[in-house]
A protein has these predicted regions:
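A composition/biophysics-driven feature that prefers long, compositionally simple stretches
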Residues: 1-194
Length: 194
C-alpha cells in the first residue's frame, strides 16, 4: 500500500535517511544495494540471527563474488543501547485442550506425518506463533502478542524446546515431559542448529 511510503517520506524528511521502497521497480534488493555500496574486499557486519538462511546464502553468493567479508555475529545496537529494556521475565502459561481444541501429542503427530511426506527427519520452527500453537502455551515476551521467545526442533521421536528456563512452570514442564519435549537454554539453538 503506497500510503506507507507517503507517510514514511513525510516522517523521515530532513533525517538524512533515504527510503528504499521494497518491491518497487528500480529499487535494489538489500543484497544488491550492499554489493553496490561495499567495495571489493570490503566488510559487512550484522546480527545474523535476524536473517533467514536464504538471505544469508544470497549474501554469501553475491557479496562473496566481490570478496566481501561477512561478519554474522555483530550486534552493534546491543553494544550502544545503554537503557535497552530487558526481556520480560513473566512465566508463560499452558492452555488446556478445551481452549486449544487439540492436545500437544495430536499436533506433534500431524507435524511428523507431514515431515514424513516430505522425507524430513528434522523440522526447525522459529515462528513464535507456530510454536505457541504447537505446544499450547502462551506468554508475555512480545508486547500486544501472547507469545514467548523460543525455538522448537521436531524430530521423529523427540522435540527440543529452546527457551528461557525461568519462564516454565511445573504445569508446562509436566506437559512437555509427557510429550517427550526436551528443554534447553534459549541460546543453545545457535550451536545445536549448525
Amino acid at each position: 500500500d503506497g500510503r506507507y511510503f507517503t507517510q514514511a517520506l513525510t516522517e523521515m524528511e530532513g533525517s538524512g535517511v533515504r527510503l528504499m521502497k521494497m518491491f518497487v521497480d528500480d529499487t535494489p534488493s538489500t543484497t544488491e544495494w550492499l554489493a553496490q555500496k561495499i567495495p571489493e574486499g570490503g566488510k559487512v557486519a550484522f546480527d545474523g540471527r535476524v536473517l533467514s538462511m536464504g538471505e544469508g546464502q544470497e549474501y554469501e553468493e553475491v557479496l562473496g563474488a566481490k570478496n566481501i567479508t561477512i561478519e554474522y555475529e555483530v550486534d552493534l545496537i546491543d553494544q550502544i543501547w545503554e537503557d535497552r529494556p530487558s526481556l520480560s521475565k513473566k512465566p508463560c502459561f499452558f492452555l488446556e485442550d478445551k481452549y486449544t481444541g487439540e492436545n500437544v501429542a495430536s499436533k506433534l503427530k500431524r507435524v511428523r506425518e507431514k515431515m514424513a511426506e516430505y522425507g524430513a527427519t528434522v523440522h526447525l520452527i522459529a515462528s513464535l506463533d507456530d510454536n505457541a500453537w504447537l505446544l499450547n502455551f502462551r506468554g508475555d515476551d512480545i508486547y500486544f502478542f501472547p507469545l514467548v521467545l523460543d525455538y522448537v526442533i521436531v524430530r521423529k521421536d523427540s522435540v527440543d524446546l529452546y527457551i528461557d528456563d525461568s519462564k516454565l512452570n511445573d504445569r508446562i514442564r509436566e506437559e512437555m515431559a509427557k510429550n517427550n519435549v526436551n528443554i534447553h537454554p534459549y541460546n543453545d539453538i545457535y550451536d545445536d542448529a549448525k
